[in-house]
């Protein structure tokens, strides 16, 4: 049984909801799944005034626990076409793991959210992949066998790089069932590959 960590950052709950779907898909594929988040960097008073979701039940992860998993599925909102600074800050603390090769051969996968259809979903995921490749991780995306990413009947996220959701400029749009289904598929797909690699 593969051990999968779903590690995310979510300001307003969109990525949190996607993380839950990713985790459900991995569990359904037989994996032992843990959901954790990275620490918030925004001062609490500022976060509250901005309406950020501070009551997320997922515990905060530590860098030292990452090698305990066969696969890590990362979730982040987009910030100008890149991952959020909270996730970047967490990953920038993994130098010791890089030096010792602790993540080499682990499966890495990414899902994301943007405000708009063309707000940087794909660049966020592919730029995230650079860090995972430096760690020697095996990148897994969202293959076209998950045909929901080709749905043209509604506005939807999703690409071969990973599941995504669109939050709308004011954050009022929640992940659609189509997007959540892709997230579940990605979780299951990663879990199956991780189980094969773990032997």
From Swiss-Prot:
Enzyme class: oxidoreductase
Binding site for FMN: 10-15, 78-80, 113-119, 134
Flavodoxin-like domain residues: 4-190
Chain residues that bind substrate: 98
Binding-site residues, NAD(+): 12
Key word rRNA-binding present: no
EC number: 1.6.5.2
Cofactor: FMN
The keyword Endoplasmic reticulum belongs to this UniProt entry's keyword annotation: no
GO MF assignments: flavin adenine dinucleotide binding; FMN binding; NAD binding; NADH:ubiquinone reductase (non-electrogenic) activity; NADP binding; NADPH dehydrogenase (quinone) activity
Keywords assigned: Flavoprotein, FMN, NAD, NADP, Nucleotide-binding, Oxidoreductase
Domain of life: Bacteria
Reaction(s) catalysed (UniProt annotation): a quinone + NADH + H(+) = a quinol + NAD(+); a quinone + NADPH + H(+) = a quinol + NADP(+)
Entries under Gene3D superfamilies matching the protein: 3.40.50.360
GO (cellular component) term, any one: membrane
Record note on cofactor: Binds 1 FMN per monomer.
Family according to the record: Belongs to the WrbA family.
PANTHER family tied to this protein: FLAVODOXIN-RELATED PROTEIN WRBA-RELATED (PTHR30546), FLAVOPROTEIN-LIKE PROTEIN YCP4-RELATED (PTHR30546:SF23)
Name recorded for this polypeptide: NAD(P)H dehydrogenase (quinone)
